[in-house]
Amino acid sequence: MNNRVHQGHFARKRFGQNFLTDQFVIDSIAAAINPQPGQAVLEIGPGLGALTEPVGERMDKMTVVELDRDLAARLQVHPQLKDKLTIIQQDAMTVNFGELSQQRGKPLRVFGNLPYNISTPLMFHLFSYTDAIADMHFMLQKEVVNRLVAGPGSKTFGRLSVMAQYYCQVIPVLEVPPTAFTPAPKVDSAVVRLVPHKSIPHPVKNIRMLSRITTQAFNQRRKTIRNSLGDLFTVEQLTELGIDPSTRAENISVEQYCKMANWLSEQPEMQS
């Protein structure tokens, strides 16, 4: 039997499809999400409905974003869900989550078993809508969850860690083995909860500046900051900001990155 076929659907590699089939894991995730009637619940990549069903049975209505036309068509005729679902057949990377929140008149509760091939860019897309999101629960590669929760000094601390923690409180929920999926992925998975900060702890004036600094620093993570960010800061400027010029990117805190971004935003040559 072809292990890429589940419930008559052939898992498409280009969409990174791995279908969740372990009922204990499914129930545990639904319990962690704890959806309540009247909330604006949205699922990204519902697939064959493994999570849609236990969440949907508690809701009067919910929204799903599904790129695969065959899976979207199956959901349209799902006996228990079809009257509850608003189906958006679209790439989640192009969805305006702010508009969806406005339409519902409340912040979104977003969840999904995210395709591993788009999970990181999709997280960055969602971070730009955190003012329209109440919380997010995602199944991701365990390695990605480790990066999301990592702190300074960890080898897994990187740009994703900084940007995620700038916007959200990041809470690991559950580890999931490959055997919970069909077809089984080659990596371990984990569920993470991201709760946007009600008030950003270390606000930056220009988020693009924070993105630029973290990209540049972590792209050259083996170098000291005086070298990787040498075109942006002098040794004296870094010292004045309370940052050791001889340290590396992974040893600088989120607060310190925000301090650097704000200082850079104030420089006349950066105003254009």
Swiss-Prot record:
It is found in: Cytoplasm. HAMAP family: 16SrRNA_methyltr_A. Its main location: cytoplasm. SMART domains: rADc (SM00650). This is Ribosomal RNA small subunit methyltransferase A. Gene3D superfamilies: Ribosomal RNA adenine dimethylase-like, domain 2 (1.10.8.100), Vaccinia Virus protein VP39 (3.40.50.150). GO terms for molecular function: 16S rRNA (adenine(1518)-N(6)/adenine(1519)-N(6))-dimethyltransferase activity; RNA binding. It catalyses: adenosine(1518)/adenosine(1519) in 16S rRNA + 4 S-adenosyl-L-methionine = N(6)-dimethyladenosine(1518)/N(6)-dimethyladenosine(1519) in 16S rRNA + 4 S-adenosyl-L-homocysteine + 4 H(+). It comes from the Bacteria. Specifically dimethylates two adjacent adenosines (A1518 and A1519) in the loop of a conserved hairpin near the 3'-end of 16S rRNA in the 30S particle. May play a critical role in biogenesis of 30S subunits. The keyword Cell membrane does not apply. Its EC number is 2.1.1.182. It is an enzyme of class 2 (transferase). NCBIfam families: ksgA. Keywords: Cytoplasm, Methyltransferase, RNA-binding, rRNA processing, S-adenosyl-L-methionine, Transferase. One of its GO terms (cellular component) is cytosol. Belongs to the class I-like SAM-binding methyltransferase superfamily. rRNA adenine N(6)-methyltransferase family. RsmA subfamily. It holds the Pfam family RrnaAD. S-adenosyl-L-methionine binds at N18, L20, G45, E66, D91, N113.
